[in-house]
């Protein structure tokens, strides 16, 4: 687990250097989590990578996710809705001072979509939050509860994605999904290419 965390941090750090040029109004990304689906430490883990973490909250890691921020418009987007969604959303929106514009899902493993539950009436009672999903991921959400209830109650508004077709987020940002190999039991798996005015970044949370 620790090796995967280290590789993730190194890769995302390299891309961050290229994506943000340091100007206050330039788009940038925020690393919201680096752990696998269960977080770190994860349930029932007694390996060396978990033992020291149980009693030290400073060593806890949230599940892999990044946020996209455009300071010029105060708009933010999230890639993947993890089990740590509530904390990650608060970090990304700076206590709701920024406008949350939607979630881009990568695939149907528990660390990457189950945070959508917070958008339902039991928690946020959200109103048509855009959730961007590939065809199989969209079908998974619309045909299976409790996710289908989010659609029926219009807590979320699913936006259909297609492989390598770009979505224009605003005048400064676009994002493009692309298929990657992974264990696709319930949906396809994608990475995302995020393009700003001058730089671009690729985010792939899971790949075989």
Predicted feature residues:
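Bacterial Sec-dependent signal peptides at the C-terminal "C-region" and cleavage site
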Residues: 13-26
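Core dinuclear metal-dependent hydrolase active-site scaffold
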Residues: 23-92, 158-208
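Short, glycine/charged-enriched secondary-structure capping and boundary segments
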Residues: 44-47, 92-95, 117-121, 145-148, ...
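Active-site metal-binding motif and surrounding structural segment of the metallo-beta-lactamase
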Residues: 62, 67-132
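Structured loop/turn residues at beta-strand edges in well-structured enzyme cores
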Residues: 98, 111, 154, 171-173
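A short, active-site helix/loop in glycosyltransferases that binds the activated sugar's phosphate group
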Residues: 136-145
């Amino acid at each position: 687990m620790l090796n995967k965390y280290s590789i993730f941090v190194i890769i995302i750090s390299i891309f961050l250097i290229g994506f943000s040029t340091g100007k206050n109004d330039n788009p940038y990304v925020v690393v919201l989590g680096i752990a696998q689906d269960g977080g770190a430490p994860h349930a029932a883990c007694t390996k060396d990578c978990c033992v020291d973490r149980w009693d030290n909250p400073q060593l806890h890691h949230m599940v892999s996710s990044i946020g996209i921020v455009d300071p010029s418009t105060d708009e933010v987007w999230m890639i993947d809705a993890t089990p740590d969604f509530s904390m990650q959303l608060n970090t990304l929106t700076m206590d709701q001072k920024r406008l949350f514009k939607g979630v881009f899902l990568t695939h149907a493993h528990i660390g990457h979509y189950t945070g959508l539950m917070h958008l339902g009436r039991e928690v946020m009672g959200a109103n048509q939050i855009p959730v961007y999903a590939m065809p199989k991921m969209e079908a998974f959400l619309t045909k299976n509860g409790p996710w289908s209830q989010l659609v029926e109650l219009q807590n979320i508004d699913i936006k259909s994605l297609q492989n390598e077709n770009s979505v224009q987020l605003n005048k400064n940002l676009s994002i493009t999904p692309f298929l990657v190999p992974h264990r696709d039991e319930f949906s396809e798996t994608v990475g995302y290419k995020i393009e700003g005015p001058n730089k671009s970044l690729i985010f792939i949370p899971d790949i075989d």
